[in-house]
Structure formats: C-alpha cells, structure tokens
C-alpha cells in the first residue's frame, strides 16, 4: 500500500511539473511574434522621454507590425509612468483616401471607454453629495417606470441592475437624434428587467444610458455639461467631446470598418453614419490618447478621494478571472500583474485603456478601425516594454521551491519510518 501511495505521489508530482513547464513555455512562445516590416507607415511623435528610448524604439516596431497584421488605418498610443507622460505617438493615416497622416492630437472614437469617463464623473457627483450611489434612482428620476424593484446608481454602473443589453448590433447603429439622456430612455424604458437588480451581471449599454439620465436629473443639467464641468475642464481634457457629427470639429480621424464584419481580410470601408446622442455615456465620446492618459493619471492623484478610488476598483461581479468594478474591468495578466482596464469596440473604433497600479504605468491605444482584434502576441510584448520584465527562470525557480516544499511535507507525513518502542 505504501508503495502504491509513493507511486501515485510521484506521478502527480511529475504531472504538476510537466503542466507548469508546458504552461510557461506556451506563455513564452505566444509572445514570440515575427514582426512585419512597418517602415512604410508614417509616424508623428509628440512626447518622447529619452530615458525610455530603447523601450519606445522596440514598441514602435511592435505597434507598426500590429498595424500591418490588423490592417489598421491609424493608431495612437500614449504611455505614462509615475503620472508623467513619457511617450505619445501616432501612426498611419487619419484618412486613407487622401493619405492624411495621423498625429497625437488626432481625435478618435473611444467606444465603451466612454463608460469609464461616465463612471469617474458619477463618483465625483457622489463625493459632492449630488446623488447617493445606493439609493433608488426613482427618487431622482420618476420618469423611469417602476419595475417592482429598487435600482441604484451603483448597480447601473456595475451592470448589475437587470437593464437589458442590445438585442442586436443594429441597435447601436441608430440614426435617430435625442436631445437629452432622459429623452433617449424612450428606446428601452418600457422593457422588463432581465433579472432582479443586484442578483446577476449583464453588460448593458442601456444601463449606462439610464445612469446618465439619473445624473442629468440629479444635477438639473444636460449630461454633456456635467461631463465638461466635472471631468474634462478640471483635467484639461481639451480634445474630449461628445460625437454629435459636428463638422466644425478639426483633427477628427475618418472612421473605418471591415467590409466583412470582424474579419481581417484587409478590405475596409468608411463607417456608416451613426447618431451617438442616445448612448453618449456608454459609447459616444471622442478623445485622444493623451487626454485619456490624463484621466488615468488623475486617479493616482487627489482628483478623487482614496475612499472613492477604492470603491471604483472594488470587484462587484466576476466572470472567471475577469472582475467588473465601477466603469473598470479588473484582472491579472499572465504574469499575475494586477491591471485595471476597459476596452472599446464599435463601428470605426477600437480602444484600450489600461492601468497597472502597482507599477504606476498607464497605457492607451486608439485606432480608427472598428472591432479590430489586437493580437496578444503584439499587445503583451508592447506593454512588457514599460513594465518589469517577465523573468522566466524565476517561474521555474519558484516551481522548484514549491515542489521541494510539498515533497518535504508529504514525505514527513506519509513516508517517515515509524519508530516502534
């Protein structure tokens, strides 16, 4: 019997070692991407900290290669370290047809990263006692029909209110104009909730539309004015604005989509007209990479209280390894580095905003191609340039120490000869 236990133990031990080695090799191999030549892609630099020149040069090669792989018309990137902008650069063409080069001041759609902006403004209103995150919204917004349950702002902000998502992609492509967030409630306010608030999670753009209507009513101002007063003006986000198809706006890139949705065949066309007035809070803002870095950096300062920041980055829902806070997703990357982030993907837009809180690194990537799939083999090596280098031998060494520790425990528990007196 003892021999059988030993055999099973060493078999399991060997399997654990094998699985660990295979996982680490797969992680290492997944990042070994052959970079495509991007010398023909124009680039324009705004900020370049010479202290990070090596990392920036490597990142240029990676991002240009990613543009080739994904057929991105333009891409804008900004990186900050310790709340200081160390790199801002744009690549490619803001308009493919006339070959207008993109630059760091080019303005992109940011898609669902708009939710992060809305969430920060919401927390600011809560700090100022303009609304209570935990009180029923109907006390503020009686225009929203009674659903038989209490719905709170924090439930809306964390996608736990039971407000339905889009039934199909076409709901995001509306051309109907609305004059306020309250008016845009007509699109869904009479629909039933899909679950009792607080009992489940369902990512909902309409939930954020309802949240913006609550903010409007609480402040007796339109949503755009609230965002400008509480966020854009104090943080000097001068290029962040709602997308109202205003022809007077300059520096706005041309938006493109793949001819075959979600494909990577290289065939693109201009995005169709969309009126974003009904979904500003969930996906209707324009911005630059530098403006979004200002927002990310501000959360490390005194723009919000530490209590508010902790509330924002608290996990309210989890799906496997992904957690959702107030306008932010949270997860650990393959190297177990904690990150706060949000993605944006829609017609004419793909965006990424990431904070690595333990390393004081913030990163923004914007593109004017809708639903672009940034490959892990490019995205992770790019971010690794500005983070502590993954040390693969350290993983092996830790594995070895853990296995020795387990071996000693098991050996002491089961295999030590008994002394019979």
Placement of each model-derived feature along the sequence:
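Short linear capping/connector segments at secondary-structure termini
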Residues: 44-45, 93-95, 106, 136-143, ...
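Short, surface-exposed loop or secondary-structure junction motifs
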Residues: 148-345
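Solvent-exposed coil/turn segments that connect beta secondary-structure elements
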Residues: 82, 94-96, 161-162, 247
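Short, conserved clusters of charged catalytic residues that mark active-site
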Residues: 58-62, 139, 210
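Catalytic loop of the DD-peptidase/beta-lactamase superfamily, centered on the K-T-G motif
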Residues: 2-89, 219-221, 228-229, 233, ...
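A short, polar/charged loop-to-alpha-helix boundary motif
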Residues: 94-104, 373-382
């Amino acid at each position: 019997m003892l021999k059988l236990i030993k055999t099973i133990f060493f078999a399991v031990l060997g399997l654990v070692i094998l699985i660990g080695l295979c996982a680490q090799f797969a992680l290492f191999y997944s990042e070994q991407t052959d970079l495509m030549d991007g010398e023909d892609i124009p680039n324009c630099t705004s900020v370049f900290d010479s202290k990070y020149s090596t990392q920036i040069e490597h990142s240029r090669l990676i991002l240009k290669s990613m543009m080739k792989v994904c057929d991105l018309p333009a891409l804008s990137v900004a990186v900050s370290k310790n709340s200081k902008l160390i790199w801002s650069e744009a690549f490619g063409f803001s308009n493919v047809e006339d070959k207008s080069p993109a630059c760091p001041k080019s303005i992109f759609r940011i898609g669902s990263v708009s939710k992060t902006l809305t969430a920060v403004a919401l927390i600011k209103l809560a700090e100022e006692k303009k609304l209570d995150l935990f009180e029923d919204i109907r006390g503020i917004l009686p225009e929203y029909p009674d659903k038989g349950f209490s719905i709170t702002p924090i439930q809306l902000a964390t996608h736990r209110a039971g407000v339905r998502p889009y039934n199909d992609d076409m709901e995001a492509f509306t051309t109907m104009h609305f004059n306020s967030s309250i008016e845009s409630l007509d699109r869904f306010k009479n629909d039933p909730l899909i679950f009792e608030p607080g009992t489940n999670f369902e990512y909902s753009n309409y939930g954020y539309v309802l949240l913006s209507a609550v903010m409007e009513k609480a402040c007796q101002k339109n949503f755009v004015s609230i965002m400008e007063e509480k966020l854009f003006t104090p943080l000097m986000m001068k290029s962040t604005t709602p997308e109202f198809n205003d022809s007077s706006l300059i520096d706005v890139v041309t938006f493109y989509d793949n001819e075959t949705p979600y494909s990577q065949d290289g065939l693109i066309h201009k995005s169709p007209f969309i009126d974003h007035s009904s979904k500003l809070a969930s996906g209707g803002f324009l911005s630059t990479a530098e403006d979004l870095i200002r927002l990310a950096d501000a959360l490390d300062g005194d723009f919000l209280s530490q209590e508010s920041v902790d509330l924002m980055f608290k996990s309210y829902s989890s799906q496997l390894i992904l957690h959702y806070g107030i306008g932010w997703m949270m997860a650990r990357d393959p190297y177990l580095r904690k990150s706060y982030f949000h993605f944006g993907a829609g017609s004419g837009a793909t965006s990424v905003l990431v904070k690595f809180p333990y390393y004081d690194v913030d990163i923004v990537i914007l593109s004017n191609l809708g639903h672009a799939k940034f490959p892990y083999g490019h995205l992770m090596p790019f971010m690794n340039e500005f983070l502590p280098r993954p040390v693969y031998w350290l993983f092996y060494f830790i594995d070895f120490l853990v296995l020795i520790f387990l071996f000693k425990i098991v050996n002491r528990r089961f295999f030590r000869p008994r002394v019979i007196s």
